[in-house]
Regions:
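Conserved N-terminal catalytic/coupling substructures associated with nucleotide/phosphate chemistry
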Residues: 1-154
Length: 154
């Protein structure tokens, strides 16, 4: 787990993603959710920016509860994401240096839940995490996930 009192010591990597979120829930959160779920899991930090030196810095979310409600709405909407694998314990408002952020801990999806994808098309909406980025999976990788999960005989 991260030491939130020393957030500036962390960098984005294959398990940490910072998102500004001052203008609302970023659309790119779904790619990161899919990528973390289909990889080793990770933590999304809403209300955190990555500075030029790559260090992380807490912003101050004006209404973090609204962001959480928006996130839950998307997680429960099959038009947004194929499956919700989060529990209420995975999402939390934290205060860092007097600033409110939201942490979203995304566990790795169980093999029989994979792939976790955006929208209705697993071939176009499945992502994996590599380094600091979320990358769309190739159709071959998606079909392999589906075979492993028992979702198709492709």
């Amino acid at each position: 787990m991260l030491d939130f009192n020393n957030l500036q010591n962390y960098r984005e990597n294959n398990r940490i993603e910072a998102k500004n979120a001052l203008g609302g829930l970023p659309e790119s959160i779904w790619e990161t959710y899919s990528a973390f779920a289909n990889s080793q899991g990770g933590i999304i930090l809403l209300g955190v920016e990555e500075l030029e030196d790559k260090s992380l810095h807490a912003l101050d979310l004006p209404d973090p509860q609204w962001l959480i409600e928006d996130l839950w709405a998307g997680l429960e909407d099959p038009k947004v994401v194929s499956q919700n694998i989060l529990t209420p314990d995975d999402i939390e408002i934290r205060i860092i240096d007097g600033k409110q952020i939201v942490t979203v801990i995304v566990p790795p999806a169980a093999w029989d839940q994979r792939p976790i994808y955006i929208g209705a098309d697993p071939i176009r909406g499945t992502y994996r995490r590599s380094g600091e980025g979320d990358y769309r999976c190739t159709p071959e990788v998606v079909r392999a996930m589906m075979r492993e999960s028992g979702k198709c005989e492709c």
